[in-house]
Amino acid sequence: MGVTKKPDLNDPVLRAKLAKGMGHNYYGEPAWPNDLLYIFPVVILGTIACNVGLAVLEPSMIGEPADPFATPLEILPEWYFFPVFQILRTVPNKLLGVLLMASVPAGLLTVPFLENVNKFQNPFRRPVATTVFLVGTVVALWLGIGATLPIDKSLTLGLF
């Protein structure tokens, strides 16, 4: 059972806020039926209406039409698969490449056990998790940018 905080209606600060119309959710307002029946459907239907309106007013093509007689030299995946594509492209052994890809989520699953993250919310007080995040972001960007370059410049990004 959760502990509910009852408002102190004798508190002059709370009475002043309530008199001004503030403090609407100070002691809680039930999500049923107010939010779930009235606010959420309006937001969802409004989002759908905006998407449909933009699709009708400005239709865009999905991509270039396919030409089977003029294929590109190298077929690139979507941008979010660039780091994975770069790993598979640069590692000579395909089994090792697949194991490297599987080691990324396995390594991320070990991060919570390396330090007690339940105690602190501030990232500066969680150096291991912050370091893993920063190194992972830099490596993912490095691999993603390298996937768009030719294979001889892909690891150095043409800088060295």
From Swiss-Prot:
List the Gene Ontology MF annotations in alphabetical order.
Answer: electron transporter, transferring electrons within cytochrome b6/f complex of photosystem II activity; electron transporter, transferring electrons within the cyclic electron transport pathway of photosynthesis activity; oxidoreductase activity
Q: How does it sit in the membrane?
A: Multi-pass membrane protein
Record key words, sorted: Chloroplast, Electron transport, Membrane, Photosynthesis, Plastid, Thylakoid, Transmembrane, Transmembrane helix, Transport
Q: Which Pfam families match?
A: Cytochrom_B_C
Q: GO terms for biological process?
A: photosynthetic electron transport chain
Which InterPro entries does the entry link to? Cyt_b/b6_C (IPR005798), Cyt_b/b6_C_sf (IPR036150), Cyt_b6/f_cplx_suIV (IPR005870), Cytochrome_b_C_euk/bac (IPR048260)
Name its cellular compartments.
Plastid, Chloroplast thylakoid membrane
Would the keyword Cell inner membrane be found if you checked this record's keyword annotation?
Answer: no
- Membrane-crossing ranges are 36-56, 95-115, 131-151
- Give all cystine bridges in this chain: none
GO CC annotation? chloroplast thylakoid membrane
Per the record, the coiled-coil ranges are none
Name the family the entry cites.
Answer: Belongs to the cytochrome b family. PetD subfamily.
Q: What does this protein do?
A: Component of the cytochrome b6-f complex, which mediates electron transfer between photosystem II (PSII) and photosystem I (PSI), cyclic electron flow around PSI, and state transitions.
What assembly does the database describe for this protein? The 4 large subunits of the cytochrome b6-f complex are cytochrome b6, subunit IV (17 kDa polypeptide, petD), cytochrome f and the Rieske protein, while the 4 small subunits are petG, petL, petM and petN. The complex functions as a dimer.
HAMAP family this protein is in?
Cytb6_f_subIV
Q: What is this protein called?
A: Cytochrome b6-f complex subunit 4
Source organism per UniProt? Spinacia oleracea (Spinach)
Lineage, opening ranks? Eukaryota, Viridiplantae, Streptophyta, Embryophyta, Tracheophyta
